[in-house]
Amino acid sequence: MDRIDSAFSQSSMNSDMLEPDDPRINNKDAKPEQDDEDDLEKNALRQMDYKTRRKHIQQIRIQFNISSLKQRQEFLLKLARALMAFGAPSHRIESQLVAAARILEVEAEFIHLPGVIICSFGDQDLGSSETHFVKCGGRLSLGALHKVHLIYRSVLHDEISASQATEQLETLLVAPAPYSVLFRCFLAFCLSALICPLAFGGSFLDMWISGVAAFILAYLQLYVAGKSALYANVFEITTSIFVSFAARGLSSIRSQIFCYTAISSSGIIGILPGYLILSSSLELASKNIVCGSVKMVYALIYTLFLGFGLQIGSDFYLLLDPTMRRHLEELAASLSSTTSFTGIWLADNGTDGSQIPLNGTWTFSRTIQPQDQHIHEGCYRPPISPWYLKPFPLWTSFIIVPLFSFLSSLSNLQPLKSKQLLVMVAISCCSYASNKIANHYIFNHSDIVSAIGAFTVGLLGNIYSRRMGGTAFTSMVTGVLFLVPSGLSQAGGITASGSGIDIGGAMIAVTIGITVGLFMSQALVYTFGSRKNAAVFSF
């Protein structure tokens, strides 16, 4: 009897704990056991052909740090804003966003125009799309750009979630600049003072004058032009007129202790659109015609403004000093190897008087060639000059080049306490060395010389990125920007010809050579080794 009661109580207890439609009570509704997820994936792979199966296996997926669709879309928008704000290579922005959207499994399309990125997110369930316009302007910031790339790579490697990455990007966007305005003006002073003897043949006195001009220019650019929209429109012309006027006035001193070409060229080196023309050349080489052509035309007009300002400043001083103007005309005539006259030629020793006068232009060559061997990089440097008026010897490049590379990285907002700063300086020094050696053997071809220097930079930067996990773009920027003033000095300087069109043509020749060298080095490095699944963050 006790056994029956216990069995009844056990049965009633089980019936109270289980639902009536539980499969353990009603076996006719029990569902068959589902296959394991691995078995389902194997069955799906078995139905694919070889190429589709291999592509599916190599695809990167987010498995651990999963975020909602809205958070992933916000991350893509914030990433687009950060890349534009910190000066990422414009021809790589669209490919990076597409790679991030593919790995995050977000249906999105991106269109990059100058100053704006159009992001379109699709919804397959509703059959609609949502379009966002990300408008942002900025300048090159190497430290922040390196952090953006680390965040981007952490999300794609499934190390952090999209929501965490969005917060980190927002913190970067609102963070203040690492250096004050006064310190950046001091950096501009040092850079112009160092590039004056290095690339434009300036003397010890010239470098200080060009440094002062660059300090004033940087203060006007960072402080005055940033607060006055009216002055920002005429900033380039006014500063180039001021620098050229001061340089021409100092060079007119009778003892010839200052060089106009060295001071004016190095004084405006901080506002040359070298990076802008380089990015436009890279855009055109990447078949991005809209952005590339717009930036190229803007950079050329910008360069014409600078050339126009330099010419106006020089001519305005010569208008006030006619003696100096006559002296320059006589100097130009004495340096020419030929002399031309236009008129009528008639022989005086004719006997019959029937000679016909000849009308035309007559050119006479000099029997004694002009003494121009003392002109170095457009500056007159006689051997009897004191040490502070002579060009710097070659051994000083071993001191000036690393120092210039170090200060150039700081001026592009690279943090002082970072291991990548040493890599930037090393690559930049290799860039200058290869450029100098190539210029020794190849004459009057600034584009080919710049291509060799850019190939060296690209090779070292991409190998550093592949083998040591660094960011290729930020490590290469200093070396690439070093090639622009070096290439211009090989093309005859910025003010040697006095024409803005010639300056623009020289800059285009240099940047086309840099573009070819960078693309060739990248193609060589990425030909070997495993293929990257994400977009390349390089030039």
Named regions from a protein language model:
Residues L104, V484-G487:
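Conserved NTP-handling cores and scaffolds of large molecular machines
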